[in-house]
Amino acid sequence: MNFTKILFFVVACVFAMRTVSAAPWNPFKELEKVGQRVRDAVISAGPAVATVAQATALAKGK
């Protein structure tokens, strides 16, 4: 009996929080932000990768 009361309370709280939110959650916008972060990380890592490649080539004697 207590479990059903607790479950009902949790579901009611979640429902209230979902209906009060100002802006709807857009998963595609979040996915786009993640893609931009990955793109920026790859761009910023480019010079470091080139430096490591040069160091490896020098170490091998090529």
Swiss-Prot record:
Broad class of where this protein is predominantly found: secreted
Job description of the protein: Cecropins have lytic and antibacterial activity against several Gram-positive and Gram-negative bacteria.
Location of this chain's protein in the cell: Secreted
Domain of life: Eukaryota
Recorded GO CC terms: extracellular region
Entry keyword set: Amidation, Antibiotic, Antimicrobial, Immunity, Innate immunity, Secreted, Signal
Signal sequence interval, chain numbering: 1-22
Similarity section: Belongs to the cecropin family.
Pfam family, one: Cecropin
GO biological process, one term: defense response to Gram-positive bacterium
InterPro entries xrefs: Cecropin
The protein, known as: Cecropin-D
Modified residues (Lysine amide): 60
PROSITE patterns in the record: CECROPIN (PS00268)
